[in-house]
Structure formats: structure tokens, C-alpha cells
Amino acid sequence: MTESQQAYAILDGRAEAGPGAPAQPCFLKTYRAVIAGGPDEQLPSEGILRDYLFKDSRKGRVFPVKRPRKGVREAVLEYRIVETAPDGSLSLAEITLHTGRTHQIRVQFASRKHPLYGDGKYGSRFKGDIALQSAGLQFVHPETGEKMAFQLEKPIKAPWDLNLSLIHISE
């Protein structure tokens, strides 16, 4: 079992920290993003995205690549589309990171033709701030062993409220 898998099992209550468990507290980070489009063949309504990412520091961008090589790191996230706008132009996704790579969420969705709202760097046609929110954090307290969980509510404004987004986009 990898360290990440162990962390999820502990936080979900399916396993106990014990011999071989990471000495550091295990963190489970969740995010919310508004993405272009709705579920399709490239991005079903839920799943796991697994890619190899290459960070090009000279260009200031991260690119998905086909296979591992020097400078390439695996990126894995789990997502679920929880809501899609009536016209199908935008969707709200909940995301759990299994790895934490630079621009990981942005690149993995954009590479499947679903860039984040406002993310012109990775292909969004929508103008505005990038619609990516750190939504939650879970960890086991290092001294008490208590499971700690913190959640943020979804903002009630465009583009987070998809109905308000449709009005905002059409203006």
C-alpha cells in the first residue's frame, strides 16, 4: 500500500495507523473547480485521472506527456462532477488529490478539453478569476490521533453558482 493509499484508508476509517504508517500526519486535500462543458467520453461524470506531467520552467507551464522520462512525475486525482449547467457549458467538480503536482488540476482537466473557468493559460474561453477552491482538509492529529476535518462552503456567486454563471457569461 502506498503512503497516499494508507492515508486515505486511515482517514476513511478503513485502517489504523500502525507499523509502516507514515510518521508525518497524513493529509487529504479536496478541491472544487468549475470546468468547461459537461461529462463526456473524455471526462465521465466521475473517475480517476492519471497522467505524467512535465514542468517546463522556461515556459512557465506544465504539460501532460505519454511516458515517464527525466523530469516527469505521475499525477493522480479523483473527481466527481456534482452539477452541470442546464446548457451544458459549465460543470462543478469535486476533486481529491492523490498527488500534489504544480498546476495538476488545471492541466489534467484542460488536457481532456475541460479547462477550468477563467484559466486562459490552459485554454479557457471564459474570462475571470480561475474557479479553483481548496474545499477541505482532513488529517489525523499527530498527538491525539483524532481525525480532524475542515470544509469550506461553495461560494454563492458566479461562476460557482452555475445558474448565476449563465447570466454572467451572457452579459
What is the role of each PLM region?
Residues 1-166, 170:
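RNA pseudouridine synthases
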